[in-house]
Each structure stands twice: as C-alpha cells, then as structure tokens.
C-alpha cells in the first residue's frame, strides 16, 4: 500500500491551511477571486506550464488515489467539488474564470478515474458542467503513463 508520504501530499495541506476558509466562501458565492486553484483542485502534472502548476501537479493515478485517501485532502476535495456541483452559477467560467475553468475539468476528470465509487462528486461535476465529457488531455496523459508502465514490465 502506498503511503501519503510517498507523494509529499503535505505540500497541499500546507498550501491550503491559510486559505481554506476563503476557498469555501468564494466557492459558495459562486466566484473564485483569489489564487488557490493549483492546490485545491489539482490536475495532472504536464498539463500546466508554470512552476506552481508543476509543483502541485499530480504525478500519477496512484498519487490521485493517495490524495483521495488522505484524511484531510480527500474530504476537502469532495466538499469543494460538491459545492461547485450545486452552484447556482451559470457556468464553470462564471465560477472560476479562464483558464481555471479548464483546470477544474482536468481535476474532476482525474479524480473521477481515481475512485472506485461510481457515485462521486467528480462524475457529477463532469455531467453538470461538461456535458459528461472528460478532459481529453488528461485522458491522453493517463493513457501514455499506463502504456509506459506496461512497457517497463
């Protein structure tokens, strides 16, 4: 079994600590105003180009599973995603602006594949906001990683 420490998930805990109440308030208001997307709704490493995106990027489906299993990060991601799913805003763009609306789609695509629970907020978010369509680039990166790991065996 993989431990949380194998992926340095503490980097997310540390980043969220001073802003998490602000995150909740902004999501509940339906309008993100401050800078926390990378460490609240992480996406696969390789999608973002900035050093911050690389630092907070999720390295693999295994790291995504460890994130969900983390006693603080998993429940926080679940809660934040549920708030977005039930938002009365007109679109992801209205909630997050650009490019964070695309980052959210990438995030929920990744985590919808990382959980065995078919009734999860990530799938609900894809259905509510993305017409059920996952982020294609996330799928490509995951498929490339899967093929690469098979070739190494």
Which ranges hold each PLM region?
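Mid-chain, well-packed structural core segment of small domains
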Residues: 66-115
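Charged phosphate-binding loop/patch that engages nucleotide di/tri-phosphates or the phosphate backbone
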Residues: 117-153
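Short helix-capping/linker segments at secondary-structure and domain boundaries
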Residues: 46-52, 112-123
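C-terminal end-helix/capping segment
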Residues: 57-76, 129, 136-137
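Hydrophobic/aromatic-rich, well-ordered segments within soluble, folded domains that form packed cores
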Residues: 26-61
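Short amphipathic alpha-helical segments and their helix-coil junctions
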Residues: 13-26, 84-92
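Residue-level detector of well-ordered alpha-helical segments, enriched
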Residues: 32-39, 76, 100-107, 121-122
């Amino acid at each position: 079994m993989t431990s949380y420490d194998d992926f340095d998930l503490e980097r997310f805990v540390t980043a969220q600590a001073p802003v998490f109440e602000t995150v909740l308030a902004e999501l509940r208001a339906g309008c993100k105003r401050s800078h926390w997307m990378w460490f609240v709704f992480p996406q696969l490493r390789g999608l973002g180009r900035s050093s911050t995106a690389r630092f907070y990027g999720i390295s693999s489906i295994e790291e995504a599973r460890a994130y969900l299993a983390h006693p603080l990060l998993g429940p926080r991601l679940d809660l934040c995603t549920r708030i977005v799913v039930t938002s009365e805003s007109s679109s992801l763009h209205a909630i997050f602006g650009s490019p964070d609306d695309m980052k959210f789609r990438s995030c929920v695509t990744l985590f919808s594949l990382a959980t065995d629970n078919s009734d999860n907020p990530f799938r609900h978010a894809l259905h509510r906001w993305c017409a059920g369509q996952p982020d294609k680039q996330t799928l490509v990166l995951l498929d490339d990683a899967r093929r690469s790991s098979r070739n190494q065996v």
